[in-house]
Amino acid sequence: MGDGRLCSGQAGGVPSQDRFSRSTLLFREVTAPKRRPLGASGIDVSELSLGSWRTYERIPRDAGLAVMNRARELGINFLDDARYNDETGTAPLKTGYSEVVFGELFRASGWNRDEVVLANKLWWEFWPEQDAAAELDGSLGRMKMDYIDLAYAEQPPDGLTVERIVLEVGGLISAGKIRAWGVLNWPAPMIAEAAKSCAKAGVHLPCAAQLAYSLVKRSPVEDADTVEALGAAGASVVSSFTLDGGALTGKYAQPGAQGRLSGGAEDERHAAAFRVSQELAALAQRLGTQSAPLAIAFALLNPLVASVLFGSTTPDQVSDNLKAVELAATLDADAIEQLRRVGAES
């Protein structure tokens, strides 16, 4: 499932020690992500995107800032934020403190607002009392932003039609609150319905679908009906859960590793993830690379994918994940076929 764009390209040269610090050398050894079009929106995003789900409010602020700075220095321009309820028991807000912290870190990082593509979510959690405009205004206020570039709409609750969602996001675009919209975990028939509703209402088509996609979970992204629906909408995939919650980072291949899969298979889902993690680690060793970037490269090799979303708690994790860019550009046909076979029987 390769893409001709990904069959060429080499890592940049390494500068001399006398001109750059060791830290900068490490940055230069990582190939910067290219830009890919986000559907038909006219927005180009980096091949990897930095997420924030249950991250920044759980780590020290200087650690979060270091993560953002590393992403900026390595060429990531696509950031994903979301409102969710506090789980630490210490946040000053019951919901949305994640957005407050994100905004503070963003401003401290030195990024200019127009340098990044910023995504957030419409959860419809308080609909119908709170419509899309009210929900987004709350998020913008907490982040201290005037607009976001991309709003992902979660699957609607009972009573909220796709047609109504299309009209509401159309209003947000007209008001300058968002530049484009996408869908979050929508099934293929709902994506197809959205495309038809947009055509009828004269609203921009959804440009992206954020969907779980990994060596463990290839459906629905590779399903024929999803491919058809995305094609009709002219939408790209933003791949999420590509490391399967850490299962595909390679940590379970280490002796004495602890985590949700370290005890083997507590259920069928975890058993499959454990088997895939072992296969992936073996292939990574044969290819002389690491599990995490190889797992991300798998998603990047799908031409439907505009960007792979990942989260990091350390700058080194950002750098390690960016190695996927060069892998996707330089793996030969045999290696790609071996990668495609990882987990195929799980």
Residue locations for each model-derived region?
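Active-site mouth loops of central-metabolism enzymes
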Residues: 51-62, 120-130, 159
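Conserved, mostly hydrophobic/aromatic
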Residues: 38, 50, 64, 79, ...
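Acidic (Asp/Glu)-rich catalytic clusters
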Residues: 39-40, 73, 103-113, 137-144, ...
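Short, acidic/polar
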Residues: 60-71, 128-143, 191-195
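Active-site groove signature of glycoside hydrolases
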Residues: 143-159
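N-terminal binding-site loop/beta-alpha segment at the start of enzyme catalytic domains
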Residues: 15-114
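Short Gly/Ser/Thr- and charged-rich N-terminal loops/segments
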Residues: 3-10
